[in-house]
Amino acid sequence: MLTKCEGIVLRTNDYGETNKIITLLTREHGKIGVLARGAKKPNSRLSAISQPFLYASFLFRKSSGLGTLEQGEMIESMRNIREDLFLTAYAAYIAELIDKGTEEKKPNPFLFELLLQSMRRLNDGTDPDIIANLIEVKMLSVMGLYPELDECVHCKSKDGTFHFSIRDNGFICHRCFAKDPYRIPLSPASARLLRLFFYFDLSRLGNVSVKQETKDELKRVIQTYYDEYSGIYLKSRRFMEQMDNMKKMLGDENKS
């Protein structure tokens, strides 16, 4: 049976000499895999729509296992991402996170819109660190993880200075600091952003300017939390970190 849907290319894998298996996140069907015959050939009609991060309309032949891609029509190429190595690193990380954090053939329109908005924001020049952090935090509930970000995990206080307790799964206020000597320090700005990322709709995000110190705090908390609770390993994380370090080095050289 032929099925038409909109989807975003999460990843591609070579299959044989000329074919590709394309993993798509679709609004209607969730995450699916389709076989694109001949897509490795440069002149193939399926080659252009088999590119990572592409947003397109796909026509495929559905089956109980792997579907077969018949044709497609590009909606948005996300060209700026694919032409920029730094943006490619962030997009690959976000795509792999959503890929690893979701099951196949389970429709999730929220997740589809989240991925689409994140790719659009990266493509349009929004700070990639902020986009990556926001997606990381948004994905927690998708994976069944719910850190306490509204009040202190111990005394339930909603005011004061908050740090983050990995052990106790959430914010810990200054009155309870002694209960976790290994808590991760947070500035008020970082605490606000963590809460904002968890609840805020990405489509409403404007131009955000965040200090590097705040970014570093967010990165430490989020990555430590993922390492402790998520149970997933992302190959693209190392690539993203390498690109991030390279960007910082280039920035330091330009200042000197």
From Swiss-Prot:
GO terms for biological process: DNA recombination; double-strand break repair. Keywords: DNA damage, DNA recombination, DNA repair. Gene3D superfamilies: Nucleic acid-binding proteins (2.40.50.140), Recombination protein O, C-terminal domain (1.20.1440.120). One of its GO terms (cellular component) is bacterial nucleoid. It comes from the Bacteria. Coiled coil: none annotated. Involved in DNA repair and RecF pathway recombination. This is DNA repair protein RecO. It comes from Bacillus licheniformis (strain ATCC 14580 / DSM 13 / JCM 2505 / CCUG 7422 / NBRC 12200 / NCIMB 9375 / NCTC 10341 / NRRL NRS-1264 / Gibson 46).
